[in-house]
Amino acid sequence: MTDKLTSLRQYTTVVADTGDIAAMKLYQPQDATTNPSLILNAAQIPEYRKLIDDAVAWAKQQSNDRAQQIVDATDKLAVNIGLEILKLVPGRISTEVDARLSYDTEASIAKAKRLIKLYNDAGISNDRILIKLASTWQGIRAAEQLEKEGINCNLTLLFSFAQARACAEAGVFLISPFVGRILDWYKANTDKKEYAPAEDPGVVSVSEIYQYYKEHGYETVVMGASFRNIGEILELAGCDRLTIAPALLKELAESEGAIERKLSYTGEVKARPARITESEFLWQHNQDPMAVDKLAEGIRKFAIDQEKLEKMIGDLL
């Protein structure tokens, strides 16, 4: 009998949400995603020590300024981990721009180009890389410009429909709407504590975004992210891609039985609305208290882990 992970792969491209190379070898995903928190976790793994040492040594060659060395080494470590992962996945690695730049379009573009250059210098072409940016107005504008220059982007920390619409209209390659963090908010802020998978507010959000994109012929890839249980994952079978943590990949692989496709669109393509303006985007996003809370929290958490990573690097310089 087939297992649920194999069955899911019939309908959806499976991506590993981890920086753990051992997990890549085990589950053989198409792509992989990382973020500052995952890079920080990966940096604690003994087998990665050589990647850290290489990043530190490289940074010392680039500058005599300690602050710049920390920035350079942190960027190089993220790319070094990405390079190791790319040896194991046939597709793309997503590497994230410093979350502290989430409200600065030009700085985000500059950092993205810096990361791309590090990959290119290591022999990796742009078609194997996605640059992750937070789905702020400024992040979306940065992605729009980068896409025009041949740098594909993954817009993350996406919680509101306004964010999803703006990303599609900007022509970004891929979005990562978060499922589990939406569920977390509703459990913490409403009286309802249990949800059937089909009623899970994170599942509903991704399903609505998927349908809207397909209805209007947007080519932006929808990649559901941040799962709390396999019920959420199975309810999104058919989504373009799903990025899944190793623990849930393991649970799927150990669960027997075929699954059914839940997301699909076979209808006609409808006319697209006029592009959302900045003021409309900000107002519509602000009307969703969950999205406001979780976007801000996500940026803060990634920034904290970026700073922890920089401190760890600084101690080695």
Swiss-Prot record:
The active site is at 132 (schiff-base intermediate with substrate). Inhibited by Tris-HCl and phosphate buffer. Also competitively inhibited by sugars with L configuration at C2, such as D-arabinose-5-phosphate and L-glyceraldehyde. Pathway: Carbohydrate degradation; pentose phosphate pathway; D-glyceraldehyde 3-phosphate and beta-D-fructose 6-phosphate from D-ribose 5-phosphate and D-xylulose 5-phosphate (non-oxidative stage): step 2/3. Its main location: cytoplasm. It is found in: Cytoplasm. GO terms for biological process: carbohydrate metabolic process; pentose-phosphate shunt, non-oxidative branch. Transmembrane segments: none annotated. GO terms for molecular function: transaldolase activity; transketolase or transaldolase activity. Keywords: Cytoplasm, Pentose shunt, Schiff base, Transferase. Its EC number is 2.2.1.2. It catalyses: D-sedoheptulose 7-phosphate + D-glyceraldehyde 3-phosphate = D-erythrose 4-phosphate + beta-D-fructose 6-phosphate. One of its GO terms (cellular component) is cytosol. Optimum pH is between 8.5 and 9.5. Optimum temperature is between 15 and 40 degrees Celsius. At temperatures above 50 degrees Celsius, activity is lost rapidly, and at 55 degrees Celsius, the enzyme is totally inactivated. Mutagenesis of Phe-178 to Tyr increases its preference for fructose-6-phosphate over 70-fold. Belongs to the transaldolase family. Type 1 subfamily. Homodimer. This is Transaldolase B. The gene is talB.
